[in-house]
Amino acid sequence: RFKKIRRLGALPGLTSKRPRSGSDLKNQLRSGKRSQYRIRLEEKQKLRFHYGLTERQLLKYVHIAGKAKGSTGQILLQLLEMRLDNILFRLGMASTNPGARQLVNHRHILVNGRIVDIPSYRCKPRDIITTKNKQKSKALIQNFIASSPHQEELPNHLTIDPFQYKGLVNQIIDSKWIGLKINELLVVEYYSRQT
């Protein structure tokens, strides 16, 4: 993880750690001139590692975004942001995307009153995300919510009730709330040149 954030910069979905300010300067000095391919590859890797996706999963999302109407890059980010594991991370119910994925896989999370154990489940507006009534589930979420540093910076497409361990998806995310310095068009270009 530390090698990844040193090379690609801060990835809040992967880890809460940040690269040291000097390491970024060293990377620029050491790397010399960066090719266009390398720049596109790094942007793609940022997206992959932030959301914790495999190459195949990301490629699938790029194909879905390409078929939809509108800007492919914006739609790609919206698809990734509306994943259940990422919504849990944004709500502060998990400290990282891998942590959120584990909560979902271990069946601690309910969407609209039903257990969902698929981290890639696509949330829709008006979905209500809660924890199971078991003490263990509530204790896990309570620890994350209490230690969540971005509680006051909750995106406007989400609402959380920390006392009832409940989150609400109000709408599809606006791109300014992504919180990741990324040029999504370079990711789309990377895949368009691969085929």
UniProtKB/Swiss-Prot annotation:
Bridged cysteine pairs (disulfide): none
Quaternary structure and partners: Part of the 30S ribosomal subunit. Contacts protein S5. The interaction surface between S4 and S5 is involved in control of translational fidelity.
UniProt-recorded name of the protein: Small ribosomal subunit protein uS4c
GO BP term, example: translation
Gene Ontology molecular functions: rRNA binding; structural constituent of ribosome
GO terms under cellular component: chloroplast; small ribosomal subunit
NCBIfam families linked to this entry: PRK05327.1, rpsD_bact
Coarse class of the protein's main subcellular location: plastid
Pfam family, one: S4
Protein task: One of the primary rRNA binding proteins, it binds directly to 16S rRNA where it nucleates assembly of the body of the 30S subunit.
Name of encoding gene: rps4
Family to which the UniProt record says this protein belongs: Belongs to the universal ribosomal protein uS4 family.
Keyword line: Chloroplast, Plastid, Ribonucleoprotein, Ribosomal protein, RNA-binding, rRNA-binding
Domain S4 RNA-binding: 82-143
Subcellular location(s) of the protein: Plastid, Chloroplast
SMART domains according to UniProt: Ribosomal_S4, S4
